[in-house]
Amino acid sequence: SKDKALREISKLDYINDGDDATETDLGCSGIWLMPVNPSPTYHKYDVADYYGIDETYGTLDDFETLLAECDRRGIKVIMDLVLNHSSSQNPWFLEACEYLKGLGGAEPSAADCPYFDYYHFSKEQGGGYYPVEGTDWYYEAQFWSEMPDLNLDCEALREEIAEVTKYWLDMGVGGFRLDAVKEYYSGAPQSNIDFLKWLTETVKAQK
């Protein structure tokens, strides 16, 4: 209920009440939220919707209220941003798989289905690759079969990521904590550095 949400938010005063003259709070200037996006798992590190809030934590309106109350107290909210992989239930992945099922032997094209390039699909089953049901294609998922790896070289995906960060920053989020950054490009540290540089520049330009 709304009243319950307000009672819970009042507990932010224990973290920082926004009054430098008091000594009853911890004086914290930031809160790091572990993944809060919609996800089918308990840990939420497989995002099904990068623009939503998992119902476990309330609604998008509840989140906006939290951001406003934190801002009033001088508390920045840092979100966990999972970019190494998504959930297998993410519409991007589901649409890409449906597209592959309908090819009938034709070659895939990102022009026909942009989400095909969001992931690593292959006709060969390498290590950490799993079959796309109903096709002769495989997808990469190094952590778990239900966490398909994102193709961070894809320009369309990078544009999508930029939309995601702008969406949350515009709402009032103070920044992002990145998960599994060493695995963005496993075994290729310079590629990781280059991507993180791009992401940093992108986010700084949005703030």
Regions found by a protein language model. Give the residues of each.
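Acidic/aromatic-lined carbohydrate-recognition and catalytic surfaces
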Residues: 1-162, 170, 181-207
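Receiver (REC) domain switch/active-site residues of two-component response regulators
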Residues: 174
